[in-house]
Amino acid sequence: IRFNNLTLGYGTRTLIDSLTGEVRCGELTALVGRNGTGKSTLLRAIAQLGEIHSGDIFLNGKPIGDISPAELSTLVAFVTTDKVRIANLRCRDVVALGRAPYTNWIGRMQQLDNEIVEQALASVGMSDYADKTMDRMSDGECQRIMIARALAQQTPIILLDEPTAFLDMPNRYELCTLLRKLAHEENKCIFFSTHELDIALELCDSIALISPPQLHILPTEEMVRSGHIERLFTTGIVSFDPETRTVSIKEK
């Protein structure tokens, strides 16, 4: 994903201004920043679900405006923060929706498609839920099914908007470890927003940090040394120590 002088916002408000940089294949990149600074707006713009004020986004070297919806579905999979409840559809069938770009005009699944669906379910630890319906599952379980759908789509780019939001602590680390493995072993570009700074610092190759209206994209080690993370904490009550990579609350 490459950004060229990209400006995003809504109405007259600019959230991200004149962004130039890239999110690379083979890496897990976290998008961090305060609430309301444009994390979801940026992800939605990459997925052609939001407007661009100016500049451009390139996917695999091609301007996003020149990419058809059909082609985009083979390039980008997007997992949103929306709570999905599909009452009458089995989890296996929900994950199979990720194969839609590759099936024939009547949507018939081939043996390879079925194998990919089963592998996606196994990757997120949800094989035992394959025949259950999502209306009988927790938020975290539903989120994992939607991530499995994205994996089944087999795109080079995967976008996730706060994928760990409904997961407990062990599952947060397990999920991000899985995403890192996919990025490294399958050369995928995986870009996800998160408020889990500790996970981002430990597991991500690069960090994209929004400091309105700028967005800085750096390898994790460089981001730690850059001072950008410290500037997130502007109240004086909370501080970030780049040596220990920890956030602490100052005593009164």
Predicted regions: what they are:
Residues V32-R34:
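The feature captures the beta-strand-to-loop junction immediately N-terminal to the Walker
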Residues A47:
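Helix-to-loop junction immediately C-terminal to a conserved catalytic motif
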Residues G55-P63, L72:
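Conserved ABC transporter NBD signature motif
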Residues A96, Q111-Y129:
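Conserved ABC ATPase "signature" region
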Residues I158-D161:
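Catalytic Walker B motif of ABC-type/P-loop ATPase nucleotide-binding domains
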Residues T194-H195:
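H-loop/switch region of ABC-family ATPase nucleotide-binding domains
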Residues F233-K252:
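ABC ATPase nucleotide-binding domains
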